[in-house]
């Protein structure tokens, strides 16, 4: 008999969910956070296969070269495109790489940041690598993730758009319609770049407006 059958896990789960609401994370927040993490994961895993396509290198019976690539390098490679693709297609990939960089920074702050709670009636935020207690010399980047309206919707849209793009890139040399599909995504990818940049730099933008 599985051990969870003798433990009231539904009640415990609901208790934890209630405790999270007391931190200001309402059900909609948790749903959209989950949706964003899934969509970003779809982009991230499909990106690897898209890079195999762009490199035109076989990975059969060899360790994929992407396995040891730093995240920043994967975005750089995406942005470089491929000389066999059209100028319009490569231009879309270049913008997508910049969007991915901003969105990845937001994702890291959300997943790895400290939750800053102001009580059940206020929306919390997340702070990554803060300089608390007089600490200095951190080599990891500082970051913020805000989940106020409309930021969660914006990052979900951006992540989904990037996934659609790399899904098309993966088959760009086998599907005769893929390149045209990529070109047609220009507006969506421009929008993803705008959204991702806004959420990544929201703290700086807010401080600038105050000044």
Question: Can you say where each PLM-predicted feature lies in the sequence?
Answer:
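Acidic, Ser/Thr/Gly/Pro-rich intrinsically disordered interaction regions
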Residues: 2-38, 45-211
């Amino acid at each position: 008999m599985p051990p969870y059958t003798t433990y009231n896990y539904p009640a415990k789960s609901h208790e934890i969910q209630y405790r999270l609401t007391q931190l200001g994370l309402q059900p909609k927040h948790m749903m959209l956070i989950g949706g964003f993490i899934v969509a970003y994961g779809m982009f991230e895993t499909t990106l690897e296969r898209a890079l195999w396509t762009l490199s035109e290198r076989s990975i059969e019976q060899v360790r994929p070269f992407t396995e040891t690539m730093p995240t920043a390098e994967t975005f750089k490679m995406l942005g470089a495109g491929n000389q066999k693709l059209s100028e319009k297609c490569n231009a879309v990939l270049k913008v997508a790489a910049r969007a991915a960089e901003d969105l990845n920074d937001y994702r890291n702050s959300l997943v790895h940041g400290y939750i800053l709670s102001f009580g059940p009636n206020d929306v919390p935020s997340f702070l990554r690598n803060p300089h608390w207690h007089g600490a200095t010399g951190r080599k990891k980047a500082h970051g913020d993730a805000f989940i106020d309206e409309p930021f969660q919707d914006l990052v979900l849209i951006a992540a989904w758009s990037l996934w659609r793009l790399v899904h098309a890139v993966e088959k760009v040399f086998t599907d005769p319609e893929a390149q045209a599909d990529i070109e047609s995504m220009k507006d969506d990818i421009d929008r993803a770049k705008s959204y991702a940049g806004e959420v990544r730099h929201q703290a700086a933008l807010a401080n600038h407006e105050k000044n």
